[in-house]
From Swiss-Prot:
PROSITE patterns: ALPHA_2_MACROGLOBULIN. This is Alpha-2-macroglobulin. One of its GO terms (molecular function) is protease binding. Disulfide bonds join C48-C86, C251-C299, C269-C287, C470-C563, C595-C771, C642-C689, C821-C849, C847-C883, C921-C1321, C1079-C1127, C1352-C1467. The lineage of its organism: Eukaryota, Metazoa, Chordata, Craniata, Vertebrata. GO terms for cellular component: extracellular space. CDD domains: A2M_2 (cd02897). The gene is A2M. Residues 1-23 form the signal peptide. It comes from Pongo abelii.
Amino acid sequence: MGKNKLLHPSLVLLLLVLLPTDASVSGKPQYMVLVPSLLHTEAAEKGCVLLSYLNETVTVSASLESVRGNRSLFTDLEAENDVLHCVAFAIPKSSSNEEVMFLTVQVKGPTQEFKKRTTVMVKNEDSLVFVQTDKSIYKPAQTVKFRVVSMDENFHPLNELIPLVYIQDPKGNRIAQWQSFQLEGGLKQFSFPLSSEPFQGSYKVVVQKKSGRRTEHPFTVEEFVLPKFEVQVTVPKIITILEEEMNVSVCGLYTYGKPVPGHVTVSICRKYSDASNCHGEDSQAFCEKFSGQLNSHGCFYQQVKTKVFQLKRKEYEMKLHTKAQIQEEGTVVELTGRQSSEITRTITKLSFVKADSHFRQGIPFFGQVRLVDGKGVPIPNKVIFIRGNEANYYSNATTDEHGLVQFSINTTNVMGTSLTVRVKYKDRSPCYGYQWVSEEHEEAHHTAYLVFSPSKSFVHLEPVSHELPCGQTQTVQAHYILNGGALQGLKKLSFYYLIMAKGGIVRTGTHGLLVKQEDMKGHFSISIPVKSDIAPVARLLIYAVLPTGDVIGDSAKYDVENCLANKVDLSFSPSQSLPALHAHLRVTAAPQSLCALRAVDQSVLLMKPDAELSASSVYNLLPEKDLTGFPGPLNDQGDEDCINRHNVYINGITYTPVSSTNEKDMYSFLEDMGLKAFTNSKIRKPKLCPQLQQYEMHGPEGLRVGFYESDVMGRGHARLVHAEEPPTETVRKYFPETWIWDLVVVNSSGVAEVGVTVPDTITEWKAGAFCLSEDAGLGISSTASLRAFQPFFVELTMPYSVIRGEVFTLKATVLNYLPKCIRVSVQLEASPAFLAVPVEKEQAPHCICANGRQTVSWAITPKSLGNVNFTVSAEALESQELCGTEVASVPEYGKKDTVIKPLLVEPEGLEKETTFNSLLCPSGGEVSEELSLKLPPNVVEESARASVSVLGDILGSAMQNTQNLLQMPYGCGEQNMVLFAPNIYVLDYLNETQQLTPEIKSKAIGYLNTGYQRQLNYKHYDGSYSTFGERYGRNQGNTWLTAFVLKTFAQARAYIFIDEAHITQALIWLSQRQKDNGCFRSSGSLLNNAIKGGVEDEVTLSAYITIALLEIPLTVTHPVVRNALFCLESAWKTAQEGDHGSHVYTKALLAYAFALAGNQDKRKEVLQSLHEEAVKKDNSVHWERPQKPKAPVGHFYEPQAPSAEVEMTSYALLAYLTAQPAPTSEDLTSATNIVKWITKQQNAQGGFSSTQDTVVALHALSKYGAATFTRTGKAAQVTIQSSGTFSNKFQVDNNNRLLLQQVSLPELPGEYSMKVTGEGCVYLQTSLKYNILPEKEEFPFALGVQTLPQTCDEPKAHTSFQISLSVSYTGSRSASNMAIVDVKMVSGFIPLKPTVKMLERSNHVSRTEVSNNHVLIYLDKVSNQTLSLFFTVLQDVPVRDLKPAIVKVYDYYETDEFAIAEYNAPCSKDLGNA
């Protein structure tokens, strides 16, 4: 049976009839069991059984065999004779995701037995998972909201356990993750805040399923401004080389649907082909440019001659690129739209719309062709020529109004195994030459192959060319020819049909046909209701079993609309609304559906269109949309004997067998369906025995199998294939990008009404919903729109900030989109905070007609400081006066619009801040402290303000300000850590003292997440970190910063997700920098010179890294730690033996390192040495550097201690507190004295002067707070009293010890006393702020500022000028640490960002930032060599009587070292008149 299975590929078989005489026994029992070749575990699978011509009862059984054992699918199934019976079965989950198994089917009866075994593919059923984000694009610091949804293959919700979801940034870093969560109702919602400085680019949400398979969903993070309007460019999609003109239209539409007034510039270009090697003038693009004004509809139209593009010329792209730029009238806003047109040489094209893939001799071959032009437009009334040589068919026909021609070919006389039909309209035109493109008239041809049937009986399904629409019934015609001799006395022949979809059998049916004992020909119809169960591709199989044992059949494929059973509808009521009104969102779906809603501003979709959730995108999740063919391992070679190559004589007719691989038999129809057949019926055409000796030159013996597999693979390889009264006035201030992101459950009637408040944005909101139901599955709504609109509204234009006394112009622009003219009064509400003078003398109401706008202006002189609100109202008035030729109308609703916008008014001069801190512990008695608040003589009037804060916890102030600990920028990798690390110490402290609340925890974890993201910006490919990261050209990792990040990331793991790869990579990088003596080599620059101690650099750095490793924590036996401790012990021994000792900073680090390592002896030795060098003053202890810089002269108050001294004192404090097993009472006494000094150095936010001192000091204070924490039942009373009339009392107890209690101090200057009674300790902090006018004094920096031009003579000086800076260091050191140049903008001007960014090309500029009205320039250091810096500023809003702006340069780590200078705009006195 197994011999002669290979046919040689060069053989061609034409078999007219092949019917072995011993197979024609009348009424022989026939069995057929059909099972899909691909089965899924844990899914409802189905197999179908047909028993024919049986006179006894039989049972059918099926079992699966694998290497892990056998499993029965069904046993002893009794099936009726001549009834197609389908049985459902399920396969348990396998340990292998995909496996080939043996399927055995056995039919058994008293006299009959049939058994067959074949292979099937078994795959584990996997859920369908998708992710939906609220938007496709986000700005830095926005929150990403997303949903994870899981369904089965029928789109019903699955409440599965998802092992892992994470977010990955553009560099592949995993920045957030969620583990092991259960879906509810088939979904779960998440949110994640982006940092203020994330990597920009493509991110993705990754869902990892239990199967290990992953689903990914991309989104983009960019800095962007939402477009106000859309530029719509309309050009022909296709133009032919014969066209002489093309029409172009450009329209500008605001997101609220109104036309844009403005000017348009259009360019159309045909570019030179990239593939050509020609350059120079000949390779220039052919372009046409034109411009014009947009009309009243916001559109511009132009007819363009195509001659300029030389459409017939080669070497140029066969495409025209159209670019249109619209500049909005009255603003500098310019947006661009693009479209392209394909150039085609095809003038006409013929294509088969409907044609059979195979033909049956005697049944007409049906076909339909369409004639279209080069643009795809049907051409009617044209004669086309049809030819079918094998059938001697030659015809012509005229196309109908749709360009269609239908034809049928009589196949009775076709003697070959193929039929080729060729269709032609015109012959190809003569060639123009090698430089020119010739026109083309495309012909069409189609080849159909013979269907094999030994009985000469056939059934044929008529093709359907269109997609089957949901909710309708499709009728399919079945044509048949029956050979009377093959019926053998049969009176009724049953045709059985089944439909497969999504890889499984979904429907079956039977059609009975009364037959006569003669040849029969006819047709009947099959009705198919189109529902979601047969989408997206339905395959229909029809077959009949003849008494001879022959099976006749056909299969057809139908594309089905992507139907979803859950019909979801979404609508807004009303569909247009004024801002801030209530509206209703109505959702209808299957009862009890869980519906996920989303509504976003259309501007977001214009910025980056969404990959919208749709029925099509959901169907694309299916692993098998259409099962066809068999995967390679499942190919059945058949077990029939081959026949020899000689003539066969049957019934007086001679047949010559010839091999043909394209000839169709019943087996191939089943294969098309992806069905395995277990049968004793004849379903295969006979195989011809090979004659290899005659064909050796044609190829290897096994080529037949190879061809078969590739053919199957090519065909699919199991292919995946009630409304309120609106107000008369609106006040607008809420402008979100995502408006609605909610989950709702519809009621038992299938309806949910959601009340919403329309945001203040004047735009169109686009909403969508998807719903999940246990019964009906998934449904997706079409987009619903709500237009938030006002008949008219007012917009304000003002600068970000001004200085008190400056005059600026406040502009209010009123826009009217009513169909009629209105008379509008525009009023600015008076306020004592400013003086307003109308620019126009006449303040009478303004007449604004349809689609018009009017601007009203005031000259404003601010009088008060701080945020000053400007309230402008525009009201439509009732009036009988004419507006033009008509009486002004008044809108029924929204006749008054009010906009409130704040403006920051700043005092003149330079702001100074002084903080006074006290830790008062009454211990049952009373303690008091006097406070004298004085002001310097050069203080700016009214600029002084002071407040006192009362907290019951030493870390209270820092807890309130964890993201604002320093009043300085956070633009580098080290500075970012001050936003990150303190949150860990706060959480540890509150956890240990049992004070952690969910609110504080949530807030701190949020900060940790954003800090983590931001820090990854500074990571290098090798796992190290540097101050500005690789993107700022710093190619070398920084040893010190890498150790800092490593220990902090390791400590943060207790609270947030940190990718272990970051920790491992950093640790490896650091270990590679360890020398043989255990010390570490320095890599990268240290921006703080204070920790550079000459020869001790290596010891200091090694001590710092050892501390970091022990804080991870690594054990002292870890090889890297063990060697590092050897380095430190050796260094301490050398220092003890030497004359000069060790730097105080290094000693403090050594003391803490030995404490962490548990080396108490060494800890005591170093602390004793430190104690001898300590500065003891006012019951406090601290340490100073030996070469401490002199404090600047002329300070009104004593400045904060330098960063390095706070840092080394904090390390000493940590060493006292890290005694093992616990600090002694002597340690705590020493620690308390240190804490008194450290707390005195805190700034108003709870931080210190710079980055490292803040991080280390807060770490030390948190350890001290935890070591000394006591929970007392008694309260402390705090009284703050002035020498005048002011008095205020606070109470601090266990319930409010973390509460920041604050009061302003009204008397300045003034004398105050602060008294505390009761129990516990109270932390008091007084903050005094004032402005002073800069005076000439000696600074450690030389700072010069000039403007170019310097005078107002040049015409552009009113609107633009350059700021030129010169900076050098003149202090006591050779160079400064990292320095910041802070340039404040003069009022009404903004920096030109590209010119600021250009500064980063300088070797000395590490980074630049534009923050509100300041430009920040980071310098890695400043020496005595002068640095020159330039950038440009532009006028944003005219301001008169401009005050000078301040430029300040300061050392980031020695903040007392600074210099200030002033500059003014060249036209500072008359800018308001510009």
